[in-house]
Swiss-Prot record:
Domain of life of the organism encoding this protein: Eukaryota
Record's protein name: Protein C-mannosyl-transferase DPY19L3
Intramembrane segment boundaries: 185-197, 216-230
Gene Ontology BP annotations: protein glycosylation
Organism: Pongo abelii (Sumatran orangutan)
Predominant place of localization: endoplasmic reticulum
């Protein structure tokens, strides 16, 4: 399969406009230029410098990632088919629709081909705009047609440069979020440096370019930055409206570009629910954010031709349940501590029950089964019952859906990110507990949320939001490695904010009786500067070596297969095989598929299980009948799957099929007592012997070191 081989030779103190001056900092303020005009100029200068650095660091990150991609594959030198093969698995499937739109004679015909597609799933016509999140490919194809770039920029470069450009926006949004939280752009600079030096754990865009998360996460970061600003107290009405607009647009674009949007926003809704229940942010602002989430999802639902999976999402059920519970349960935030605690537990129970009730009702009305594999996976993952379900086990056995590896923390510690994160997290968690206890105890408190009596600890609403956000997404990342990119990028933001926060250093210095306004200033600037110098000293040489290392794409077997398909099979031929390979077949050859990697449809999952019987212990006539039921003309067998050794016993694809079919697994090891020996040998092995029962149904037409292609007989 595809591999990579070595290429052949051929400072001043800043003042934030939104931070109210504290009495302890009066002396520091007096050192700033005096007079209203001077302060305004100083503020403008700070914003200009910080904004310029934000744009520069974002662009540099984008160029850095694009250069790594070029150096790793020699993308500018390889053939078109090799470029397309480099878009592995589902990435190739998504890119194929961009290519399809560009190859259509007109935009109208391109849209029609997506809405009435009969090549992605054989013998079926499906609406791709309803089934998949591919509006970004549609939009990009329209831009490429309209803009005057066709003469000097190939379509594939227009596509990948757009994704790398979004990475610039992503890093800039992280920078701004940290700046908003701490009040200094130095914090944003540190967050960006940490993002780059921890690249292995913060992004995978350079080798999975078309992946949905690479489109979605930049908009998610913009949304978090906008929410952080929105939760500040005493915003001007115009600022508040503009911020709400930014939140809505970023939430909508995030929802439109990733099929897992509803689960990420459910985590956000849980953050809002927690803070609202503990009186740590204004209820009216939480209501606005709940409403924006629902509105964005419903708008996406309309654009996706009323995709039932969106309507049946837990997020919509949860947010509606919160609104209903608020109406039913009055005076939630009054009474003594025990009284309020009891009301809070009752409120939590009511919202949970309403959420499950509404979700079940909606799913029964819509007859929705598209997301049941996710809940089967979660049930098995958290030990709520063993399962032999093929789909659930397919996820359980993938490393990306396993627990976060322990060596991740070693890499994060090398850059000091993990140590700084734990330091800041520990302090803010303690403060959050104190503030929550105070809020629950003091029901007569008439002060605004986030403010407490002078001399007590304080946690601003925007800080509280980012604290609970990082905790919940941390649990998500620890349980599912694929979701670590949502957490590690926010780790950079949260850790850098804490090291540059005057409130954090004030609390820490007061606790050890070393408080002094000058010391706060010294600590909040010297610590991040020292860390930046350390990062430059330790990682700059390695980054330069990485940029100078030249490799090239090398996958001759797959290239040979794609060229053979293009030259020797009819345009309307139907191909069966593994999901990952068939995505490449569609992109490189345009042939019709039996199945594909977009696994969010129940009928497709059933079809995939049937096609995968080519790797199970089944009779040739049974496999032939299953494949022909989907109109299959050719089947591609892969030695890397048939003789797989990458996964442990019980997690190889052939083992999952054996268990699902009730057959004993191959090789030494235990089997469940009720599993029985199969009546037939493994199909993918036995077919290569060219025995009469197999030759009667299958004729080998292509073979190399990796792939075997068989043509199915039609008269059986």
């Amino acid at each position: 399969m595809m591999s990579i081989r070595q290429r052949r030779e051929i400072r001043a103190t800043e003042v934030s406009e939104d931070f109210p001056a504290q009495e302890e900092n009066v002396k520091l303020e007096n050192k700033l230029p005096s007079g209203c005009t001077s302060r305004r100029l100083w503020k403008i200068l700070s914003l200009t410098i910080g904004g310029t650095i934000a744009l520069c660091i974002g662009l540099l990150t984008s160029v850095y990632l694009a250069t790594l991609h070029e150096n790793d594959l020699w993308f500018s030198n390889i053939k078109e088919v090799e470029r397309e093969i480099s878009f592995r698995t589902e990435c190739g499937l998504y890119y194929s629709y961009y290519k399809q739109m560009l190859q259509a004679p007109t935009l109208v015909q391109g849209f029609y081909g997506l809405i009435y597609d009969n090549k992605t799933e054989s013998m079926k016509t499906i609406n791709l705009l309803q089934r998949m999140n591919i509006y970004q490919e549609v939009f990009l194809s329209i831009l490429y047609r309209v803009l005057p770039v066709q003469k000097y920029l190939e379509p594939v470069y227009f596509y990948i440069y757009t994704l790398f450009g979004l990475q610039a926006i992503y890093v800039t949004a992280l920078y701004i979020t940290s700046w908003l939280l701490s009040g200094t752009w130095l914090s944003g600079l540190l967050a960006a440096f940490w993002y780059v030096t921890n690249r292995i754990d913060t992004t995978r865009v350079e080798f999975t370019i078309p992946l949905r998360e690479n489109w979605a996460l930049p908009f998610f970061a913009i949304q978090i930055a906008a929410i952080t600003y929105f939760l500040r107290p005493n915003l001007q009405p115009l600022s508040e409206r503009l911020t709400l607009l930014a939140i809505f647009i970023s939430t909508f674009l995030f929802s439109l570009t990733w099929q897992f949007n509803q689960f990420m926003m459910l985590m956000q809704a849980l953050v809002l629910f927690t803070l609202d229940s503990l009186d740590m942010l204004p209820a009216v602002k939480a209501t606005w954010l709940y409403g924006i989430q629902i509105t964005s999802l419903l708008l996406v639902c309309i654009l996706q031709f009323f995709n039932s999976m969106i309507l049946g999402s837990l997020l919509i059920s949860f947010n509606l349940s919160v609104f209903i519970a608020r109406k039913l349960q009055k005076n939630l935030k009054t009474g003594s501590f025990l009284n309020r605690l009891g009301k809070l537990l009752l409120h939590l129970f009511m919202v949970l029950c309403l959420t499950l009730f509404l979700n079940n009702i909606i799913k029964k009305i819509l007859n929705l089964k598209s997301d049941e594999h996710i809940f089967k996976f979660l049930k098995a993952k958290f030990g709520l019952g063993a399962t032999r379900d093929f789909d659930a086990n397919l996820y359980l056995c993938e490393e990306a859906f396993g627990l976060l590896p322990f060596n991740t923390f070693g890499r994060l510690s090398d850059t000091l990110l993990f140590y700084a994160y734990i330091f800041v997290l520990s302090i803010t968690v303690i403060v959050a507990f104190v503030v929550a206890f105070h809020n629950l105890s003091d029901s007569t408190n008439q002060q605004s949320v986030g403010k407490m009596e002078k001399g007590t600890v304080d946690l601003k609403p925007e800080t509280a939001y980012n604290l609970i956000h990082t905790i919940l997404f941390g649990f998500l990342a620890l349980s599912t490695m694929r979701m670590k990119y949502l957490w590690t990028s926010h780790m950079c933001v949260f850790a850098s904010f804490g090291l540059c926060s005057p409130e954090i250093w004030e609390l820490l210095l007061k606790s050890v009786h070393l408080y002094n306004p000058k010391r706060i200033c010294i600590m909040r600037y010297s610590v991040p500067i020292l860390i930046l110098l350390y990062l430059c000293y330790k990682f700059w040489p390695g980054m330069m070596d990485e940029l100078s290392e030249l490799r090239e794409f090398y996958d001759p077997d797959t290239v040979e297969l794609m060229n053979w398909i293009n030259s020797n099979t009819p345009r309307k031929a139907v191909f069966a095989g593994s999901m990952q390979l068939l995505a490449g077949v569609k992109l490189c050859t345009g042939r019709t598929l039996t199945n594909h990697p977009h696994y969010e449809d129940s009928s497709l999952r059933e079809r995939t299980r049937a096609v995968y019987q080519i790797y199970a212990k089944r009779a040739p006539e049974e496999v032939h009948a299953l494949l022909r039921s989907f109109g299959t003309d050719y089947v591609i067998l892969e030695d890397s799957i048939c003789y797989e050794r990458r996964h442990r016993r019980g997690c190889r694809l052939r083992d999952l099929l054996d268990i699902a079919n009730g057959h004993m697994m191959d090789g030494p090891g235990e089997n469940d007592p009720d599993l029985k020996p199969a009546d037939h040998p493994r199909f993918c092995e036995e077919i290569k012997r060219n025995l009469p029962p197999y030759v009667a149904y299958f004729t080998r037409v292509f073979q190399n070191k990796t792939f075997h292609v068989y043509k199915l007989s039609r008269n059986k």
